[in-house]
UniProtKB/Swiss-Prot annotation:
It holds the Pfam family Pribosyltran. 5-phospho-alpha-D-ribose 1-diphosphate binds at residues 26, 72-73, 98-99, 102, 104, 124-132. It comes from the Bacteria. Gene3D superfamilies: 3.40.50.2020. Homodimer. Orotate binds at F34, F35, T128, R156. One of its GO terms (cellular component) is cytoplasm. Its EC number is 2.4.2.10. Catalyzes the transfer of a ribosyl phosphate group from 5-phosphoribose 1-diphosphate to orotate, leading to the formation of orotidine monophosphate (OMP). GO terms for biological process: 'de novo' pyrimidine nucleobase biosynthetic process; 'de novo' UMP biosynthetic process; pyrimidine ribonucleoside biosynthetic process. NCBIfam families: pyrE. This is Orotate phosphoribosyltransferase. Pathway: Pyrimidine metabolism; UMP biosynthesis via de novo pathway; UMP from orotate: step 1/2.
């Protein structure tokens, strides 16, 4: 497992963003783990997370020249990532959307750098159903930008339904024709659990969950 994946999972565990136990998801599935990016709730934690994002993006080799953060969790993530890249000598323009359009001040739903003519990388925490990402794709295209990729912290690698054996990330990637990059995924989490004595008891529930809900790419 590459360093940024291990580093991210260690950070998530330390921040209590990654928890093990029994959690009921919005889908109704009972999951042995839960990820909440909102627990990266300080400057240091967010800066460390952004470095993991940057390493994953660089390793994937995606071509982009602007960062876009969908409201709401994508906004601080994209901002932190822009700061991480500035520290690496790359000053990237940044934009995000608001949920409700303003009819005063600067107006509209978009804030930040103009999207027109840019290759846009969408930054978010996870892809659950893909609704927010699909909305972001529409916003970017309507503003004249070209979506070039999507990056998220964790890919659960689980099927959308018994009828659709793809994950939400796979479905979005296929529909949009762009890569979805994850800092880490369920396969990485299984490897991480196997290598950590404190987590070894959670490996069997994780394997059982993958066996029931995992996509074909998690084997």
């Amino acid at each position: 497992m590459t360093d940024h994946r291990t580093r991210f999972l260690q950070l998530a565990l330390g921040a209590d963003a990654l928890r093990f136990g029994q959690f009921t998801l919005k889908s109704g599935r009972l999951s042995p783990y839960f990820f909440n990016a909102g627990r990266f709730d300080s400057g240091t934690k967010t800066a460390q997370l952004a470095q993991c994002y940057a390493d994953a993006i660089d390793a994937a080799g995606v071509d982009f020249d602007l960062l876009f953060g969908p409201a709401y969790k994508g906004i601080p993530l994209a901002t932190a990532l822009a700061c991480a890249y500035a520290g690496r000598g790359r000053d990237l323009p940044l934009a995000f959307n608001r949920k409700e359009a303003k009819d005063h001040g600067e107006g509209g739903t978009l804030i930040g750098a103009p999207l027109a003519g840019h290759k846009v990388l969408i930054v978010d925490d996870v892809i659950t159903a893909g609704t927010a990402i699909r909305e972001a794709l529409g916003i970017i295209r309507a503003a004249g930008g070209v979506p070039s990729g999507i990056v998220v912290a964790l890919d659960r690698q689980e099927i959308a339904s018994e009828q659709d054996r793809r994950s939400a990330a796979q479905a979005v990637a296929t529909e949009a024709g762009i890569p979805v990059i994850a800092v880490a995924n369920l396969s990485d989490l299984l490897a991480f659990a196997a290598e950590n004595a404190d987590l070894v008891d959670f490996r069997e529930p994780l394997l059982a969950y993958r066996g029931r809900y995992g996509t074909d790419t998690t084997g």
